[in-house]
Amino acid sequence: MSKKYDAGVKEYRDTYWTPDYVPLDTDLLACFKCTGQEGVPREEVAAAVAAESSTGTWSTVWSELLTDLEFYKGRCYRIEDVPGDKESFYAFIAYPLDLFEEGSITNVLTSLVGNVFGFKALRHLRLEDIRFPMAFIKTCGGPPQGIVVERDRLNKYGRPLLGCTIKPKLGLSGKNYGRVVYECLRGGLDLTKDDENINSQPFQRWRDRFEFVAEAVKLAQQETGEVKGHYLNCTATTPEEMYERAEFAKELDMPIIMHDYITGGFTANTGLANWCRKNGMLLHIHRAMHAVIDRHPKHGIHFRVLAKCLRLSGGDQLHTGTVVGKLEGDRQTTLGYIDNLRESFVPEDRTRGNFFDQDWGSMPGVFAVASGGIHVWHMPALLAIFGDDSCLQFGGGTHGHPWGSAAGAAANRVALEACVKARNAGREIEKESRDILMEAAKHSPELAIALETWKEIKFEFDTVDKLDVQ
């Protein structure tokens, strides 16, 4: 052993910087944005990331001789400049598939964004994108039902789904909460939603909410003749309680439940998605806490990665921002991760932030959910950006209507159908948005009042996290 093993510390780049390596189809590929400490060569920083996120440690160890390090190690195979940023660079790293447990997003993230993010040689580190190989994708369950099945279950075709979050999101009793749900659904919405932080608080225990909401949904269905639904948030203190809530929602014959996938965790989310698949339930996903992770342009995980991981872990709908509302997200970036939620193949396109080709095979797609600070004036832009396979959710833009939630729901429904009709007739709905909405308002006093109420409301703030393109 002494002839083959040299104790001590050697530079990471001696082992993990392999510029001649050609990635395999079965490799998991990752793109990191790296900002190293002053004086540390790029190759050493990039190799350190590859090492610490795969097989390496700070010292040479004798037990390397007990395995095939050349087979298992991560390899940094390319370094690129970041446009407009002299401090940072992109490091492209290939990981052999055998480093990861089959179907486990939890395991993938534990490796790629684990201890390496606290590495002293780095000032900042951001995971920009992942190329999941088909060999890994085939081990993941993915969306419990997917876009096509969800449309069939809800009997909604040819337009986006229309919904809203119940407001105020905290403080209502179960009965009053159910009353608001009923008003929204009878007014014309397809779906209503628990907010992310409604679980089972003293003012409203989860079982009361579920029962009153189920009553409201069924009454609205009887009155309108349409299929209605409400996202019942099953996020809970323990997995056991989460499944208990899901089972009760099923007993009440509710079509869809909800989970906060980042705060709840990927293990819980994958388990709940598997349960939904077996029990014929739809699963709505909220992304609470995402901005803590993805908003800093140099450190963390880009949301496109979190969106890809959700499609693999399982969810039928995912919040993606709005572009035009109150939440962060520019148009091209948002379209980039919407593509990865819905399409079967997404090509590399740096103008949309996609660093790799991504083949999703036959995995079902996920509805993109636009929610946060939107109202009727935004409807043409939302339809143009998100298309039909989306869910447009107006919280304040429903409940803030001067005539109440039912009128707000009616205004949104009329606005949506007017925009869809105009688009189908070949009109440029973004350029002609005012004419389309004002024309529809002639036949809808609810829409006319909504247009007047929100005519001055805009959220014109610059995006913090911008695409690195010139």
From Swiss-Prot:
Misc: The basic functional RuBisCO is composed of a large chain homodimer in a 'head-to-tail' conformation. In form I RuBisCO this homodimer is arranged in a barrel-like tetramer with the small subunits forming a tetrameric 'cap' on each end of the 'barrel'.
GO biological process: photorespiration; reductive pentose-phosphate cycle
Annotated localization: Carboxysome
EC number(s) per entry: 4.1.1.39
InterPro entries to which the protein is assigned, alphabetical: RuBisCO, RuBisCO_lsu_C, RuBisCO_lsu_C_sf, RuBisCO_lsu_fd_N, RuBisCO_lsu_N_sf, RuBisCO_lsuI
Species of the source: Prochlorococcus marinus (strain SARG / CCMP1375 / SS120)
Cofactor(s) it depends on: Mg(2+)
Source superkingdom: Bacteria
SUPFAM superfamilies reported for this sequence: RuBisCo, C-terminal domain (SSF51649), RuBisCO, large subunit, small (N-terminal) domain (SSF54966)
GO cellular component: carboxysome
Record: residues binding Mg(2+): K193, D195, E196
TM region(s), chain numbering: none
Subunit organization: Heterohexadecamer of 8 large chains and 8 small chains.
PTM sites of type N6-carboxylysine: K193
Family from the record: Belongs to the RuBisCO large chain family. Type I subfamily.
Official protein name in the record: Ribulose bisphosphate carboxylase large chain
Reaction(s) catalysed (UniProt annotation): 2 (2R)-3-phosphoglycerate + 2 H(+) = D-ribulose 1,5-bisphosphate + CO2 + H2O; D-ribulose 1,5-bisphosphate + O2 = 2-phosphoglycolate + (2R)-3-phosphoglycerate + 2 H(+)
